Amino acid sequence: MALGGWRWARKALAAGRPLFQGRALLLTNTLGCGVLMAAGDGARQVWEVRARPGQRFSARRSASMFAVGCSMGPFLHFWYLWLDRLLPASGLRSLPSVMKKVLVDQTVASPILGVWYFLGLGSLEGQTLEESCQELRAKFWDFYKADWCVWPAAQLVNFLFIPSHFRVTYINGLTLGWDTYLSYLKYWVPEPLQTPGCAD
C-alpha cells in the first residue's frame, strides 16, 4: 500500500511539473495568489458567521479577494525574477546578499502590496478613492507591523533554500494564515469608544 502511494505521488509530481515552467509558471503563480487569498477570506468569514449570529457568508467578498490576489500574482512573479537578478544569492554562503534581498522585499514590495490590497479591494467594493485612502491610513501601520513579524523569517528561508521558480508557490503556501489576517484587518470595524464615567 505504501509503495502504491509513493508511485501515485511521483506521478502527481511529474504531471504537475509543467505548471512550474515557462509561461505556465506565470499562470500558476497568478491563480495561486487568487485562490489562496479567497480561501483565507473564506476561512475568516466562516469564523465571523459562527461568532456573529445573523451575519451571512459573502461570496462577493471572497470573489473580490480572488480578483485582488490574481492581480498581485504577476507582480510577485516578476518581482522575484527581478530581485534574483539584482541580488543573485542562495544558500548559507550568500547570507549577506540574502539579507539584503529580505530588506529590499520588506521595504519595497511589502508597502506596495499593502497599498494595492486596500485600494484594490476598496475599488471592487464601491468605495471612493478618498474612502479607500482613509481606510489605508487607518489600517496600514497595523498591516505593516504584522508584515514585519511574519515575512522576514519566511523570506529568509525562501531566498536561502527555495529554487527561484518555486518562490511564489512557497509564499502562496504560507499565505493562508496571512490572508486570513488580512481579511480580518480589512473588514474589522473598531467598536465605538465609550465615554468613561457617564454611563446611563
From Swiss-Prot:
GO molecular function, one term: mitochondrial large ribosomal subunit binding
Highest taxon listed in the record's lineage: Eukaryota
InterPro entries attached to this UniProt entry: Mpv17_PMP22
GO BP: mitochondrial ribosome assembly; positive regulation of mitochondrial translation
Keywords associated with the record: Membrane, Mitochondrion, Mitochondrion inner membrane, Transmembrane, Transmembrane helix
Keyword Transmembrane helix: yes
Family per similarity comment: Belongs to the peroxisomal membrane protein PXMP2/4 family.
Protein name: Mpv17-like protein 2
Protein species of origin: Mus musculus
Lineage of origin: Eukaryota, Metazoa, Chordata, Craniata, Vertebrata
